[in-house]
């Protein structure tokens, strides 16, 4: 642990401070700012030669600024002779374009970001709940994708919900929701979204009996909260007594707060992989959990060459 040093950019300094408190080490001294024309400026204010450096920087909004901060920081530490550089990216932005749909002329931006990080000297990446697990394969360096579910499950248990049922908001999230349901020993329901015909509104079919149940929607992220709002409405229409959503990443873009306040969702519980905006903090239906202990433990294990997978057995 003596060679371990932790630094952060401007994306989520509060999370970085929480992580170093868990590790009982100081936060490293680096100046990350901008030149007058908007270019990213990085200067390391202490010796990092021979050190095991961890850079905590989610690539959340403003996505491009935060990504460039991470890239320029990594280059600065490589040129300053750090032995190993681990990019700790609690929320991995640019993850939604992870494949090229047939006949579509689009970029695979997740691969572009992976290449950028590798080129500037990042030796290892630590992420939380990647939007798509296959993104790990875009990297030519080791990637540890840890799960936020233990933090969510612990809170669900603490709430002592009556007649609890876990719900996947779509078919793609079934594996995640099933794992949470299995961990809690409760039933699982699935929302199957279908569009009967072109230009017709989406119809939500509920697979499972939610009548009188406390339904907990589980997803990796909440963006505009439109899907969660529609899911909560469908569940209430099918007799659910209460609907709470648990999501690891609070992206909360666009009209998300307005959508949450207008919805029948009783509560939205998120982690601090992304800092909440002032509007989100003021929303009485949003509650934030601390994921720093899980991130800190993963970082400790990486630094000590211990197993990461053992954390989730």
Swiss-Prot record:
SUPFAM superfamilies: PRTase-like. Binds 2 Mg(2+) ions per subunit. CDD domains: PRTases_typeI. Its EC number is 2.7.6.1. It is found in: Cytoplasm. Pathway: Metabolic intermediate biosynthesis; 5-phospho-alpha-D-ribose 1-diphosphate biosynthesis; 5-phospho-alpha-D-ribose 1-diphosphate from D-ribose 5-phosphate (route I): step 1/1. Mg(2+) 1 binds at residue 131. It catalyses: D-ribose 5-phosphate + ATP = 5-phospho-alpha-D-ribose 1-diphosphate + AMP + H(+). Homohexamer. NCBIfam families: PRK01259.1, ribP_PPkin. Belongs to the ribose-phosphate pyrophosphokinase family. Class I subfamily. Involved in the biosynthesis of the central metabolite phospho-alpha-D-ribosyl-1-pyrophosphate (PRPP) via the transfer of pyrophosphoryl group from ATP to 1-hydroxyl of ribose-5-phosphate (Rib-5-P). This is Ribose-phosphate pyrophosphokinase. It comes from Pseudomonas aeruginosa (strain ATCC 15692 / DSM 22644 / CIP 104116 / JCM 14847 / LMG 12228 / 1C / PRS 101 / PAO1). The gene is prs.
């Amino acid at each position: 642990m003596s060679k371990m040093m932790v630094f952060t950019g401007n994306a989520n300094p509060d999370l970085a401070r929480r992580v170093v408190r868990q590790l009982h080490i100081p936060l490293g001294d680096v100046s990350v700012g901008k030149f007058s024309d908007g270019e990213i400026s990085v200067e390391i204010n202490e010796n990092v030669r021979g050190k095991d450096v961890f850079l905590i920087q989610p690539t959340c909004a403003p996505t491009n600024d935060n990504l460039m901060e991470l890239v320029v920081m990594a280059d600065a530490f490589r040129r300053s002779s750090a032995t190993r550089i681990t990019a700790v990216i609690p929320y991995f932005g640019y993850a939604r374009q992870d494949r090229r749909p047939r006949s579509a002329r689009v970029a695979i931006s997740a691969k572009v970001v992976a290449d950028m990080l590798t080129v500037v000297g990042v030796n290892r990446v630590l992420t939380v709940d990647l939007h798509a697990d296959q993104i790990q394969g875009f990297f030519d360096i080791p990637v540890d994708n840890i799960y936020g579910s233990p933090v969510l499950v612990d809170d669900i248990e603490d709430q002592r919900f009556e007649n609890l049922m876990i719900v996947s908001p779509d078919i793609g999230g079934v594996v995640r929701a099933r794992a949470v349901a299995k961990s809690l020993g409760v039933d699982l329901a699935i929302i199957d979204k279908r569009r009967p015909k072109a230009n017709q509104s989406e119809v939500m079919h509920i697979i499972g009996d939610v009548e009188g149940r406390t339904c907990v929607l589980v997803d990796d992220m909440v963006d505009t909260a439109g899907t969660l709002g529609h899911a909560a409405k469908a569940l209430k229409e099918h007799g659910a007594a209460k609907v709470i959503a648990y999501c690891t990443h609070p992206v909360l873009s666009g009209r998300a707060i307005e959508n949450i306040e207008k919805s029948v969702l009783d509560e939205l519980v998120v982690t601090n992989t992304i800092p909440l905006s002032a509007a989100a903090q003021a929303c009485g239906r949003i509650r934030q959990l601390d994921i720093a202990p899980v991130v800190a433990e993963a970082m400790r294990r990486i630094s000590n060459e211990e197993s990461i997978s053992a954390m989730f057995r």
